Amino acid sequence: MEALLLGAGLLLGAYVLVYYNLVKAPPCGGMGNLRGRTAVVTGANSGIGKMTALELARRGARVVLACRSQERGEAAAFDLRQESGNNEVIFMALDLASLASVRAFATAFLSSEPRLDILIHNAGISSCGRTREAFNLLLRVNHIGPFLLTHLLLPCLKACAPSRVVVVASAAHCRGRLDFKRLDRPVVGWRQELRAYADTKLANVLFARELANQLEATGVTCYAAHPGPVNSELFLRHVPGWLRPLLRPLAWLVLRAPRGGAQTPLYCALQEGIEPLSGRYFANCHVEEVPPAARDDRAAHRLWEASKRLAGLGPGEDAEPDEDPQSEDSEAPSSLSTPHPEEPTVSQPYPSPQSSPDLSKMTHRIQAKVEPEIQLS
């Protein structure tokens, strides 16, 4: 009996350590009032993306859910309007596996929305296939699609600067290796899928790094955010059906809820004072160092050029900084600009809101300013 009690105590102690070090996510503070600002969140019909969109809506932002499924996207928008009390949550169709869909989304957004303050690339997949254009599906959805979308929306992001781009990455980037001669290589079998997934996560981190370099002094900053181990649809989607009932209780015990997974992306989108850390990788709401492959500026630029080619970007569609990226009358005291009043747009079912030194030391100062969590209850 004593042995059983001792064993139970050890198991409980081990779980407490796992819970506080892996499962429990630190809270996101940042700006509490986003009224008059607009955010786009991809893959926001479930999981981390939906919780991210919910918190943005609760803080008053106009939130565009960019999702592939119209049925699920509109249902999520309805849920979020009900939960947040904010009618400025809408759905717009976006399939990151299709370059044509990405361009159509950008055209529709730019023609109907007068501003963009926050762009969060949350959508992602973990298994592979081939798109109609014969692309590696993992590469297209996890990197090329977001890369193209960012480029197409940059004029709006620059016009609303200071603004932010957040790329939801993963600790899997540590296992990634990019073969620039075969970026679009076919992926066959689950082992290759695991490697290819890690490669796309490395691409996310390098993309954030190079984008920050390209947009230096424009007022647009970019961050790679690791949500942590999250119990989301992405985790169980490709698990055999017979195994899911066995894994669900375990996942509930040792993985974060989507609400916890949303904290670091929200931190990168909202925390004031982190602009000097643009291009860095965040986990648990603070900067983390990455392996050499993920901070290789030469590889990041090479990936940038290869991605332009794969995305079909022309010479005039690069992310070169504008000479005067911010208006002279901008007096925003916070890290995101105070928007000007907006007129309702014709394609929206709801009216637009009226506006109302040392790296370690720097990181410590930023962390000290984090406000208490606004709960996603």
Swiss-Prot record:
Record-listed substrate binding positions: S170
EC number of this enzyme: 1.1.-.-
Record flagged with keyword Secreted: yes
Listed GO MF terms: oxidoreductase activity
GO cellular component, as recorded: extracellular region; membrane
Protein family (similarity comment): Belongs to the short-chain dehydrogenases/reductases (SDR) family.
Protein name: Dehydrogenase/reductase SDR family member 13
Lineage: Eukaryota, Metazoa, Chordata, Craniata, Vertebrata
